[in-house]
Amino acid sequence: MTRIRLEYHGHVAYITLDHPPANTWTLASLQAFLQMMVELDSRPDVVALVIRGAGDKFFCAGADLKMFADGNVEHAREVAEAFGRAFEALARFHGVSIAAINGFAMGGGLEVALACDIRIAEQQALLGLPEASVGLLPCAGGTQRLTELVGPGWAKRMILCGEKVSATLAYEMGLVEEVVTEGH
């Protein structure tokens, strides 16, 4: 079970990340996400896509680190490539893509949001790229997209130091376009 859902409401599609407790990415969910993006690209009637996390604490905490526990370099490479393919497909989506960040958006969670056209964060959200703290680097275009949005100074702080930012600071630095109250 991939624990990722695609639903349609009129001309809007919703992808919900639902992998408790933290809505993490697995290889299977990345592959399912890519297939959903292929399906969405075949639907010209879909003009908008909202990506959201199930629950109220996590938008997406990034990769499920259990995938890397055995130290298999080939598997890590396969996962990194899957991240890249999935989020590049999102970045190329023909409609408007919106990340509805309802909680923690870490690592691959922030990277999926960065691939969206618009990012809206609830006020309790916390955003970051903590990969460096576990010996990794963002692998899905996040380094480039983050730098484009916030400039090299903030990008380096977040990428190299793993600095996390609140929704308010993310708005002030241009990482998100709007901050809303919880549940909106």
Language model features by range: what are they?
Residues 20, 55-57, 103-104:
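Short glycine-rich anion-binding loops that position phosphate/pyrophosphate groups of nucleotides
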Residues 86, 90, 100, 106-159, ...:
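CoA-thioester-processing core
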Residues 62, 80, 84, 107, ...:
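Glycine-rich phosphate-binding loop at the start of an alpha helix
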Residues 1-17, 163-184:
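Amphipathic alpha-helical segments at domain termini/boundaries
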Residues 53-88, 135:
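Glycine- (often His-adjacent) and acidic-residue-rich active-site loop
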Residues 1-52, 88:
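Conserved CoA-thioester-binding segment of acyl-CoA-metabolizing enzymes
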Residues 15, 51, 64, 112-114, ...:
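Hydrophobic/aromatic residues within transmembrane alpha-helices
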